[in-house]
Amino acid sequence: MRVGTTLYKVVNQPCASGGYEKRRVIWNNSTLRQDYGKNYLATVPKYDGFCTVPDHLNYRKEIDGFLNLYEPIEHTPQIGDFPNIRSLVLHIFGEQYNLGLDYLQLLFLQPLQKLPILLLVSEERNTGKSTFLNFLKAVFGDNVTFNTNEDFRSQFNSDWAGKLLIVVDEVLLNRREDSERLKNLSTTFNYKVEAKGKDRTEIAFFAKFVLCSNNEYLPVIIDAGETRYWVRKINPLQNDDTNFLQKLKEEIPAFLFFLTQRELSTEKESRMWFNPKLTHTAALQKIIRSNRNRLEIEMAELFLDIMSNM
């Protein structure tokens, strides 16, 4: 394909897991002629530029001459049951089960809607946090990216800035600048994309964040009064089914059909949809309290240093 004045070849790059990741590799005219003949260039699809427009039900690859970088999902909603997905959502969201369904429904039907930063914490093992992240990846495909803590600190962000979901399996962003950047990203509507060797460009930013951590006290800095986080303490799973993820994948079409028919249990009450009172949890309060205690200790140490030098 040609986008603007640049040729790209779409390739399927093998992954360690056995699957493939679709990538666009910059190509050139001479190589194209060598591989396919001099007349092939005239048949190459041509676009004026890139755009990023999320839509899961009425997806369009080309929009007014622009190539949509948002990827279509693989699943078509169809009637069926989803007992394993239901059990996973209930396990993750517990007494906030209906809010959890609302969250997933908004992701699917209203991908531009801002949503809280979902933070799943537990010091225990085998809690299903990673399984939930892999389930989201299975539903939304290439529109989900797994980031590391360092990715948030890098100036280059072109590989994740246009995604629906940015997930981190072991988050530890306990520096003030990390926390401020994460909060700003969760509410901004536009963002500067930067890639190596290319000029910065501004795009619409609609990504949501799902973070997991084994640290229940200070995975990120959250101040008192902060309303952008939804923190859930996750308990261990009662059983360990090695085929659970595959069972989840098989139920995705039925679950998506359910989401298209379900009526939301909440109405939009904030920029992140939910009334902050609904997503305030004891797990969130624990992090806020731990952060306050840490600040008090740092201030006390600072005062002691000052007094010792007087």
Language-model features, listed with the residues they occupy:
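N-terminal nucleic-acid engagement/recognition segments and initiation subdomains in replication
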Residues: 1-95, 217
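AAA+/SF3 P-loop NTPase mechanochemical coupling elements
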Residues: 156-161, 194-212
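P-loop NTPase catalytic core of nucleic-acid-dependent motor ATPases
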Residues: 56-167, 171, 179, 230-232, ...
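DNA transaction DNA-binding modules
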Residues: 121, 267-310
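Catalytic acidic motif of RecA-like/P-loop NTPases
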Residues: 172-173, 183
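A short helix-turn-beta junction within AAA+ P-loop NTPase domains corresponding to the substrate/partner-engaging
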Residues: 219-239
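Conserved catalytic/switch belt of AAA+ P-loop NTPases
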Residues: 179-201
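Conserved Walker B
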Residues: 170-172, 189, 215-216
